[in-house]
Amino acid sequence: MAGSDTAPFLSQADDPDDGPAPGHPGLPGPMGNPKSGELEVPDCEGLQRITGLSRGHSTLIVVVLCYINLLNYMDRFTVAGVLTDIEQFFNIGDGSTGLIQTVFISSYMVLAPVFGYLGDRYNRKYLMCGGIAFWSLVTLGSSFIPREHFWLLLLTRGLVGVGEASYSTIAPTLIADLFVADQRSRMLSIFYFAIPVGSGLGYIAGSKVKDLAGDWHWALRVTPGLGVLAVLLLFLVVQEPPRGAVERHSGSPPLSPTSWWADLKALARNPSFVLSSLGFTAVAFVTGSLALWAPAFLLRSRVVLGETPPCLPGDSCSSSDSLIFGLITCLTGVLGVGLGVEISRRLRRFNPRADPLVCAAGLLGSSPFLFLSLACARGSIVATYIFIFIGETLLSMNWAIVADILLYVVIPTRRSTAEAFQIVLSHLLGDAGSPYLIGLISDRLRRSWPPSFLSEFRALQFSLMLCAFVGALGGAAFLGTAMFIENDRRRAQLHVQGLLHETEPSDDQIVVPQRGRSTRVPVSSVLI
């Protein structure tokens, strides 16, 4: 009798709602796969059967999503590439200039939960098509604003957030429903390569198109045409895969979405999600500040060093720093994302907490190099570029890993909502306010000193040093994530397999058949 009670009970629930059928593959940890803490990974043929898409088609979908991700970030940082020209055209200071990015991010942040809710319940392909089409039209319209209507530029940049919100909350969940395990990590790394590459191309396209056309307005007219192509590719190539099927190893029965309020409560009780989102907020704070202000800081540094003339009203400002910083952003992004994913993948074989630990190492390592890049700017622009290169490489190690953490600690029917609220948190406390905050501190410091090009440089230099401190705080948040990551991942796996039932917030239970009856026991007794 003892033997019957201690048999592999987790696959023998007699209530169909209590768990999977006997022989169900891929139970997590020692309960279903004693050699691994991972779900059993379907092969290519299994993935094709489950999703209804060939591997080639699934890969092509990821390529289309990467193209759109690249385009989104290219558009965002095209503005940064011509920032000095915008300041001169509208006759605004650093504080008002910082509002351009802040208004965009704030709109994006407000709309993200809306698209997160819709993305967990409705066709994701059509949501993205509508959002990107609207974004393309608004971006084109923003290039025709006269100099006396700066407020209208702020309004249009805010409306651009519709496209970003419709895409960024949904696209990673499509990848999660097409691939699992290491395949998913690789595809996410490809997807997130588009962030630094797109950002760098934004700087380059903004500065070069302005030089060729002789007018910065033309820099804002490049991405709308590419956006039309993106909508066509989405409509023709992307197909909607069933949510969570690749993790259940079956196209049915589908996971049922819960209420939005239940989703929020579950996410708030997920420490790995909360802490990794706080860590990612630090990444957003630093990257948002550098994205907008680094080219302007480098230009001011070279003016102080006597390497370039100052940018005066009516002059065409030098674009070489935007070009160089754009190239650095591209290279460091590709290198950092690739290094982060590969290091994490190798360490994961020996340490299941590798993902948050690699993220922590990246942030804690980047902070001193970013500080050195600012401290050396008065003496050597070459040293500044070298330290920026190292710091941004370490910072970029986080992008794909943070996305992977979210996807494996959150169940499929909550992932778009989780993406949305990670976006809200990271932008609310990160890059929504950081460009404006840096500009505001710079303005306050500059007013306390006699007017000069040196005071402009020093004010921005001291204000940007805040980024190094925030980066260190983010590293601490990822160290906290490492304490909870194993249990939270296993809970998500149990839920996907149908073994974990959320009844009350403090009483998550799994079904354990004993002597022909279903008995509920606290999940804490299993998650050791």
From Swiss-Prot:
Signal peptide positions on this chain: none
Region (Disordered): 1-38
PANTHER family attached to this UniProt entry: PROTEIN SPINSTER HOMOLOG 1, SPINSTER
Localization annotation: Lysosome membrane
Catalysed reactions listed for this entry: a 1-acyl-sn-glycero-3-phosphocholine(out) + H(+)(out) = a 1-acyl-sn-glycero-3-phosphocholine(in) + H(+)(in); 1-hexadecanoyl-sn-glycero-3-phosphocholine(out) + H(+)(out) = 1-hexadecanoyl-sn-glycero-3-phosphocholine(in) + H(+)(in); 1-(9Z-octadecenoyl)-sn-glycero-3-phosphocholine(out) + H(+)(out) = 1-(9Z-octadecenoyl)-sn-glycero-3-phosphocholine(in) + H(+)(in); 1-(5Z,8Z,11Z,14Z-eicosatetraenoyl)-sn-glycero-3-phosphocholine(out) + H(+)(out) = 1-(5Z,8Z,11Z,14Z-eicosatetraenoyl)-sn-glycero-3-phosphocholine(in) + H(+)(in)
GO molecular function, one term: transmembrane transporter activity
Official protein name in the record: Protein spinster homolog 1
UniProt-listed InterPro entries: MFS (IPR011701), MFS_dom (IPR020846), MFS_spinster-like (IPR044770), MFS_trans_sf (IPR036259)
GO process annotations (BP): lysophospholipid transport; phospholipid efflux; regulation of lysosomal lumen pH
Major subcellular site: membrane
GO cellular component terms given for this protein: lysosomal membrane; lysosome; membrane
Annotated function: Plays a critical role in the phospholipid salvage pathway from lysosomes to the cytosol. Mediates the rate-limiting, proton-dependent, lysosomal efflux of lysophospholipids, which can then be reacylated by acyltransferases in the endoplasmic reticulum to form phospholipids. Selective for zwitterionic headgroups such as lysophosphatidylcholine (LPC) and lysophosphatidylethanolamine (LPE), can also transport lysophosphatidylglycerol (LPG), but not other anionic lysophospholipids, sphingosine, nor sphingomyelin.
Membrane topology, record value: Multi-pass membrane protein
Residues with Phosphoserine modification: 518
Keywords for the protein's UniProt record, in alphabetical order: Acetylation, Lipid transport, Lysosome, Membrane, Phosphoprotein, Transmembrane, Transmembrane helix, Transport
Family under the similarity heading: Belongs to the major facilitator superfamily. Spinster (TC 2.A.1.49) family.
CDD domains: MFS_spinster_like
Transmembrane segments: 60-80, 98-118, 126-146, 160-180, 187-207, 218-238, 278-298, 323-343, 357-377, 381-401, 421-441, 465-485
Complexes and interactors: Interacts with BCL2 and BCL2L1.
